[in-house]
Amino acid sequence: MKFQFIAKHRGIWPVAWMCGALGVSRSGFHAWLIRPPSQRARDDEVIGAKVRASHVGSYRTYGARRVWHDLLADGVSCGLHRIERLIRAQGLRARPRRRGLPKDHGDRSVIAGNVLDRQFTADRPNQKWVADFTYIWTAEGWLYVAAVIDLFSRRVVGWSMSPNMTAQLVTDALIMAIWRRGKPDALLHHSDQGSQYTSEQFQRLMADNGVTCSMIRSGNVWDNAAMESFFSSLKTERIGKKIYRTRAQAKADVFDYIECFYNPTRRHSTLGYLSPIDFEREAGVA
């Protein structure tokens, strides 16, 4: 490691000075320079390139464990600690999570109980859906993004985007989910107590499709932790460091994140590091 440090910084500081400071001989350093790299070093170079490709391919959001599962899926045999070392050596860092935005405080019409009760797993598709919406700032003003996630596979089955924070926003997301998955049988829909979800329009849509309503307790975001996790990932992995000039630009980016990355590609620890679509495919329901 000392010789590697010297080789890396010899364009900045004199070799003789670094050898003296690190307690190694100059002859030993020069002998190390001309020595052919070991098999492990050559393997590190190959695996390191795959590590970087996985990290960049995830929009620089994957940490060591997800990169490791990416490489295992590609048939690369290596340990997690080796991946962690190669990530550190290349200075790769996953984007940190950011705090969310405040929730809606409009009038509530219908409040349902917390039927889900933090049971964020499902035995089959279309058994439990969770829903929420978030805000994205653009130079044209706010863009509101609503989403519906199937807890069986964490797949985003419905989404909607609008410049207005209305009942139509969340209604459109649920309509898409029903259109994609078919009319549900014994489905539980879980959301917060926002005025959009308690509206007569939204409640009528659920009643017409035989959907049971569940809502978080007031002020308790952990009652919808799976949904909070998705929006946290969206902000961390895609929109957090971007400035959108138009709502159309933001819409296109959110669409790309959901349909081209999150659903088909992004690995989830809760799914054994499979993507939602791969998880459904392995379960024989995709």
Regions flagged by a language model, labelled:
Residues 1-286:
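Charged DNA-binding/catalytic regions of mobile-element recombinases
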